[in-house]
């Protein structure tokens, strides 16, 4: 009898724990290429005729509230993003979907869904799920498209500058060669001209009158 009562008590307690918690399932990983993602959170609870709150949190400890929406099945909830995020959402009887856009690599993190039953009492929320890692890839497409456009003009400019530099170099070499040749020719011409070492003195013989030897003949 005692064992039977204990078993009934444990069964009742387990049912109460299950009923007081909402189970939420999420995809373990989402890879984002276009800066936009939709995260679906499946819950195991009938939210019909209940006022509920659906929230999305960022971080291992759910420190940052990304987006939140309140509503019921009578009217669509209005989702409000937190600062630094852009979000919207919708829900049905099994799933709440959060749509995020304008994401960048800094938004890469783990995200958790939270479902709360606000009314009627008692208050219920979900057990923390395993979360979803959202990985936002860096965009390299724009660089890949613009690189060829910038590459060829740079090649043309570099080619023009190279040709101009070669032309200037060749011109300067020709001018320098001609100038050197002219200097060598002028130097050779100057070497062929006789040089006068200085004024020359004329040596004059002393004057002696000529003798007439015929006058002395007999």
From Swiss-Prot:
<dbReference type="GO" id="GO:0042802">
    <property type="term" value="F:identical protein binding"/>
</dbReference>
<dbReference type="GO" id="GO:0097190">
    <property type="term" value="P:apoptotic signaling pathway"/>
</dbReference>
<dbReference type="GO" id="GO:0006955">
    <property type="term" value="P:immune response"/>
</dbReference>
<dbReference type="GO" id="GO:0002863">
    <property type="term" value="P:positive regulation of inflammatory response to antigenic stimulus"/>
</dbReference>
<feature type="signal peptide">
    <location>
        <begin position="1"/>
        <end position="19"/>
    </location>
</feature>
<keyword id="KW-0393">Immunoglobulin domain</keyword>
<keyword id="KW-1003">Cell membrane</keyword>
<feature type="glycosylation site" description="N-linked (GlcNAc...) asparagine">
    <location>
        <position position="72"/>
    </location>
</feature>
<feature type="disulfide bond">
    <location>
        <begin position="67"/>
        <end position="87"/>
    </location>
</feature>
<dbReference type="GO" id="GO:0042098">
    <property type="term" value="P:T cell proliferation"/>
</dbReference>
<dbReference type="GO" id="GO:0032743">
    <property type="term" value="P:positive regulation of interleukin-2 production"/>
</dbReference>
<feature type="disulfide bond">
    <location>
        <begin position="41"/>
        <end position="113"/>
    </location>
</feature>
<dbReference type="GO" id="GO:0098636">
    <property type="term" value="C:protein complex involved in cell adhesion"/>
</dbReference>
<feature type="topological domain" description="Extracellular">
    <location>
        <begin position="20"/>
        <end position="150"/>
    </location>
</feature>
<keyword id="KW-1015">Disulfide bond</keyword>
<feature type="modified residue" description="Phosphotyrosine">
    <location>
        <position position="189"/>
    </location>
</feature>
<dbReference type="GO" id="GO:0048304">
    <property type="term" value="P:positive regulation of isotype switching to IgG isotypes"/>
</dbReference>
<feature type="glycosylation site" description="N-linked (GlcNAc...) asparagine">
    <location>
        <position position="106"/>
    </location>
</feature>
<dbReference type="GO" id="GO:0031295">
    <property type="term" value="P:T cell costimulation"/>
</dbReference>
<dbReference type="GO" id="GO:0042110">
    <property type="term" value="P:T cell activation"/>
</dbReference>
<protein>
    <recommendedName>
        <fullName>T-cell-specific surface glycoprotein CD28</fullName>
    </recommendedName>
</protein>
<dbReference type="InterPro" id="IPR008093">
    <property type="entry name" value="CD28"/>
</dbReference>
<keyword id="KW-0812">Transmembrane</keyword>
<feature type="modified residue" description="Phosphotyrosine">
    <location>
        <position position="207"/>
    </location>
</feature>
<dbReference type="InterPro" id="IPR036179">
    <property type="entry name" value="Ig-like_dom_sf"/>
</dbReference>
<feature type="glycosylation site" description="N-linked (GlcNAc...) asparagine">
    <location>
        <position position="130"/>
    </location>
</feature>
<dbReference type="GO" id="GO:0043491">
    <property type="term" value="P:phosphatidylinositol 3-kinase/protein kinase B signal transduction"/>
</dbReference>
<dbReference type="GO" id="GO:0050852">
    <property type="term" value="P:T cell receptor signaling pathway"/>
</dbReference>
<dbReference type="GO" id="GO:0045840">
    <property type="term" value="P:positive regulation of mitotic nuclear division"/>
</dbReference>
<keyword id="KW-0675">Receptor</keyword>
<dbReference type="InterPro" id="IPR013106">
    <property type="entry name" value="Ig_V-set"/>
</dbReference>
<dbReference type="GO" id="GO:0010629">
    <property type="term" value="P:negative regulation of gene expression"/>
</dbReference>
<dbReference type="GO" id="GO:0001772">
    <property type="term" value="C:immunological synapse"/>
</dbReference>
<feature type="transmembrane region" description="Helical">
    <location>
        <begin position="151"/>
        <end position="177"/>
    </location>
</feature>
<dbReference type="GO" id="GO:0009986">
    <property type="term" value="C:cell surface"/>
</dbReference>
<dbReference type="Pfam" id="PF15910">
    <property type="entry name" value="V-set_2"/>
</dbReference>
<dbReference type="GO" id="GO:0005886">
    <property type="term" value="C:plasma membrane"/>
</dbReference>
<dbReference type="GO" id="GO:0045066">
    <property type="term" value="P:regulatory T cell differentiation"/>
</dbReference>
<dbReference type="GO" id="GO:0010628">
    <property type="term" value="P:positive regulation of gene expression"/>
</dbReference>
<keyword id="KW-0325">Glycoprotein</keyword>
<comment type="function">
    <text>Receptor that plays a role in T-cell activation, proliferation, survival and the maintenance of immune homeostasis. Functions not only as an amplifier of TCR signals but delivers unique signals that control intracellular biochemical events that alter the gene expression program of T-cells. Stimulation upon engagement of its cognate ligands CD80 or CD86 increases proliferation and expression of various cytokines in particular IL2 production in both CD4(+) and CD8(+) T-cell subsets.</text>
</comment>
<feature type="topological domain" description="Cytoplasmic">
    <location>
        <begin position="178"/>
        <end position="218"/>
    </location>
</feature>
